[in-house]
Amino acid sequence: MALFARDRERLARRWLLLASAALAASGLLAFGVVAARVPPFARYLTATELARRVLVVHVDLGVIVWFSALPVALFHLAAAGPRPAGRFAAFAPWLAAAGALALVTGLLPGWGAPA
């Protein structure tokens, strides 16, 4: 029973790490958007297309990744019982992190356009 609890705690830590990293990245991107509007920097940061991309990725990381990863982490912390997590449960946080990284690649020049 303790082995299953450790597995669930490890999975919860991974999901919480993903959620926290997404929220931190979202905050940094928000800071970048705000800094681009400050008058001393505004004359140098005039790329409105980049600002739109940063805003889209900021919202995606903050809403999609954060609000998806946090409930999964809480579920793993609250789960109880003799059954272990599924065979592929350890792979899921890595797959979600790859998806979050794919969201961030939208910031690269020539890689997509905001809708």
Q: Across the structure, where does each feature detected by a protein language model lie?
A:
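N-terminal signal-anchor module of multipass membrane proteins
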Residues: 1-69
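Membrane-interface helix-loop-helix modules in multi-pass inner-membrane proteins
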Residues: 34-38, 53-115
